[in-house]
Regions:
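Glycine/proline-enriched, intrinsically flexible loops and inter-domain linkers
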Residues: 1-195
């Protein structure tokens, strides 16, 4: 089975969140984990298959940055962040299933791999744009998650439509198929609508 013991998940997840946050420059300041595993005297085992960890940070945002703008003809759809790898494929689907229900290889491939240094670089781009005040070119920004560019870039264009030049996406793995470039959830990447 590819299920880790509850205690190992709680310790490693907590260590990972703290390590990532510290490398990124925004330490995790709150959080908790939750699991349950009980073996009854009869030998029957009761427990939660998926352990849960919640973490959080504290931030602020100016009111004018709360509303995202609408796509209009002539705007650019761009991405900033890490290069494309074949990781996080089917991550959205895998997160909706019971852990261990899939094949081990599918479970492994669906897991994203964080890159705190790249996350910090991407965050600096966003922050630099925000600090331009009224000259901020960002109309809308979406974090790339489940579905990869296939999801985030379509969300940005929505009703206005747009042209996506898939072959201009920077690749970390030059052997990726067009399908994997389009759907993989490679990490630390955002899509931007630039006006």
């Amino acid at each position: 089975s590819n299920l880790a013991p509850s205690l190992a998940v709680e310790i490693r997840a907590s260590d990972g969140a703290s390590d990532y946050g510290n490398k990124f420059g925004e330490p995790v300041v709150l959080g908790f984990t939750r699991s349950f595993d009980l073996t009854l005297p009869s030998g029957e085992r009761w427990g939660w298959i998926k352990k849960i960890m919640f973490t959080g940070g504290i931030g602020q945002i100016e009111a004018r940055h709360i509303e995202k703008g609408e796509a209009e003809k002539g705007m650019l759809i761009v991405q900033v962040g890490g290069p494309a790898y074949g990781i996080g494929v089917s991550g959205g689907s895998a997160s909706s299933k019971l852990q261990g229900e899939n094949e081990e290889e599918l479970d492994f491939n669906a897991v994203q791999r964080g890159d705190a240094e790249m996350e910090q670089k991407m965050n600096r781009v966003i922050r630099a744009c925000i600090e331009m005040d009224d000259h901020n070119p960002i109309v809308s920004v979406h974090d790339q998650g489940a579905g990869g560019p296939a999801n985030v870039l379509k969300e940005l264009g929505e009703k206005a439509g747009g042209k996506i030049e898939l072959r201009r996406i920077k690749l970390g793995d030059p052997t990726l198929s067009v399908l994997k470039i389009w759907i993989a959830e490679y990490q630390e990447r955002c899509g931007f609508l630039i006006g």
